[in-house]
């Protein structure tokens, strides 16, 4: 009996020793992946690249004859569109009929306060001339802040009341931040697809065209506007004109308005002189391409002009004979007499700048003047 007990104890001791040895081996085993052998390359897991493709490109096309009158007699077969030199198939064609989604950006800085009464009267022009019967609009005010004053609505009364009650704020002007907000708002509106028409996305900016203190840069805004098929129009407000319209004030020591440029002796202080001085007469097309390629850098050139050229719109000055009302009326007339062409790019994921060219291939097209958006920039994939 004692022998059996001693045998059982030895068996238990042996079992405990085996369990202890197994635990020690497990404790020494690596918990992570095995290190690579010397000279053997490590295979990395594939990166999740975020690829951006352009599903549909839409460009406004304005066609005028030699007298400057709009041409309304063209069909889709009369146009040729190329993207980086490759001919594209037009999938959607329209002449002024697609409904408009409009963002109205209005400068409300104290610098243009003398022009405020004129601006407050423009509401009916936006609703009757620009929006049209099927349009919708939103209103954004900008000074040193960006304020959404009215979300998208088709109510003419709401738009007109919002503009009639604009309040003047500080002297700041965050133009680029306001434009970025406008592009974001328009991106939410349905646009055309290959199966059905959509809304034309239009931004109309009433401003001096200067920027002070924005977090965004113009190139960043324009890149997004191009990819979202947003067309930008500008109505340039003149601080010189505002000063001339201001009520006389008691004599004070000379104090130049913020942003003005003193001309040399004998040169009148016109906006043309100030623009040339401030922006160096930059080539607009070169400025557009440079801007969308260098989105974190400042852009030379009048921002409203550069934005209009980049997106197929137009920028109208109001310094001389053209009033603010006339400028808005001209833009409305153009929008409803303008062609809209859409296509799906044959190489939708080719990165870099895509140059768009639109031409009229009719025999009598020699003297026609065509304006369309010049292109868009597709950034490389993000990892």
Q: Which stretches of residues belong to each language-model region?
A:
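N-terminal secretory signal peptides that target proteins for export/translocation
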Residues: 1-9
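Scaffold/interface architecture of coatomer-like assemblies
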Residues: 27-383
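Bacterial N-terminal signal peptides
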Residues: 13-24
């Amino acid at each position: 009996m004692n022998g059996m007990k001693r045998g059982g104890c030895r068996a238990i001791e042996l079992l405990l020793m085996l369990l202890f040895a197994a635990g020690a081996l497990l404790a020494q085993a690596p918990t992570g992946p095995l290190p690579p052998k010397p000279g053997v390359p490590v295979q990395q897991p594939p990166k999740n690249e975020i690829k951006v493709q352009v599903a549909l490109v839409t460009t406004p096309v304005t066609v005028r004859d030699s007298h400057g009158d709009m041409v309304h007699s063209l069909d889709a077969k009369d146009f040729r569109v190329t993207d980086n030199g490759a001919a594209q198939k037009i999938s959607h064609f329209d002449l002024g009929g697609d409904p408009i989604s409009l963002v109205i950006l209005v400068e409300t800085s104290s610098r243009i306060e003398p022009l405020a009464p004129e601006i407050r009267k423009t509401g009916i022009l936006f609703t009757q001339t620009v929006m049209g019967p099927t349009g919708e609009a939103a209103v954004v005010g900008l000074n040193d802040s960006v304020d959404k004053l009215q979300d998208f609505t088709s109510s003419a009364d709401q738009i007109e009341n919002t503009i009639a009650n604009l309040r003047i704020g500080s002297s700041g002007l965050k133009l680029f931040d306001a434009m970025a907000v406008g592009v974001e708002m328009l991106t939410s509106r349905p646009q055309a697809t290959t199966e059905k028409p959509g809304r034309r996305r239009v931004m109309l900016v009433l401003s001096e065209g200067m920027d002070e203190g924005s977090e965004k840069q113009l190139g960043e805004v324009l890149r997004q506007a191009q990819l979202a098929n947003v067309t930008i129009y500008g109505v340039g407000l003149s601080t010189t004109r505002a000063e001339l319209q201001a009520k006389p004030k008691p004599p004070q020591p000379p104090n130049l308005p913020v942003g003005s440029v003193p001309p040399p002796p004998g040169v009148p202080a016109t906006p043309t002189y100030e623009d040339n001085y401030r922006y160096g007469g930059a080539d607009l097309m070169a400025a557009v391409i440079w801007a969308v390629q260098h989105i974190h850098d400042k852009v030379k050139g009048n921002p409203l002009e550069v934005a209009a050229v980049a997106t197929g719109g137009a920028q109208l000055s109001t310094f001389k004979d053209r009033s603010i009302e006339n400028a808005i009326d001209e833009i409305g007339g153009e929008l409803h007499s303008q062609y809209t062409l859409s296509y799906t790019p044959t190489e939708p994921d080719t990165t870099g700048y895509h140059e768009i060219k639109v031409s009229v291939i009719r025999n009598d097209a020699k003297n026609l003047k065509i304006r369309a958006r010049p292109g868009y920039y597709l950034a490389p994939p993000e990892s």
